[in-house]
Amino acid sequence: MYIYLKTPLQNHSKYLPHLVEHCSGHSALDAVNFFEFSYGLDGVSTPEYTRFEYDKRVPYEKALEKLFTPLQKSAFLYETKILQEELGDPSYDQRIYEAVIRQYINPAISLNGIEKPSREEVEKYHAMRYRPENVIVTSEKFQVFYHGFKPQNTFDQVQLQIISDTFDFEDDAYFLLLYKNHSAKEYWELYFIFWMLCFCSTFVMRRQEGNYYFLEPYFHRFGEVCWCLFPRLDYQILTPQFFEHGKQYIFKMIAEGYFKEMFFLNEYFYGIPLTRIQVLDFYKNYTYTTFLAKLKAFL
C-alpha cells in the first residue's frame, strides 16, 4: 500500500518537507509499532510529493492516523541528526538531478542542502500538508483506495522550448535534450527517446565494448520541464532496424502494463493525463524520421 502527499518545496528547498517525512515515520522506532509500521519508517521525498509504503495488511485508515498525529519533540531532535547524515553524502543520481535543475531551471533550488528550521516550522508544515485533503492512498497496483484531491490540471499550453546541449557533470560527459512548457504528447515523446537511448547505450557499452560499468541515460522532470541526459557516445548503431526493434519492445512494455506508478503520478501530480491506450497509439505512429529530427544536434 502506498500513501502519497503533496509536499512542495519550501522557499525553493526540499529540506523542510524531507525532515517532516523523517519525523512522520519516527513512531515506527518504538517496539510497539515497529513490526506493523516498519515499512513506514522511511518514506520517499521528492520536490513535489512524499510517498510512504505500508504492508497491505495495515488498514490505510490506521496508517493515515499515524501520519497525521502531531509530531513529537523527540522525533524532531532525533531525525534532524539522521537527515543531516543522509544529506552529507547524497548519491550520484541525486547530485546530477539537482545540477540540471539549478543550471537550466532555477539556481536557487536546493534539494540536498542542509538547513536549520525550527521545531515550530516543522510542526507548521506537517499540520498544513499531512491532512486528509492532501492525500491519495493506492494499492501496490495503483488502484486508488482514497483520494483527498482530484487529478492535477494540465499545464496551460505555451510554446514548447527545446534545449539541446552538452552537459559535463563531475568527470562524466553527457548530451542533454530538455523540453520546457511541454504537452502530454511531447512528454511521452521524450520518454520514448530516453528508452531508445537506453537500449543503444547498453548495446554499445556493454555488448560491443565489454564494459561492466558504464554511464546510462536519465529521464527526469521538474514542474513544466522534462529532460533526458544520455552519455556522449557514437550513436551510429541507431539504424532503422535498431529503431523498429526498440520501438516494438517499448510498445510491448506499455501494452503489458509496465510503468503503473508513472501513469498514476502523471495523472494526479504532473498534469500529463494521457491514458495507456493514447500513449500506445502515439508510439505506434512515431517514426524513425521524427526520432532522428529530435536528435539531429547529437548524431
Where are these regions (language model features)?
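Active-site His/Glu-centered metal-binding helix of metallohydrolases
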Residues: 16-24
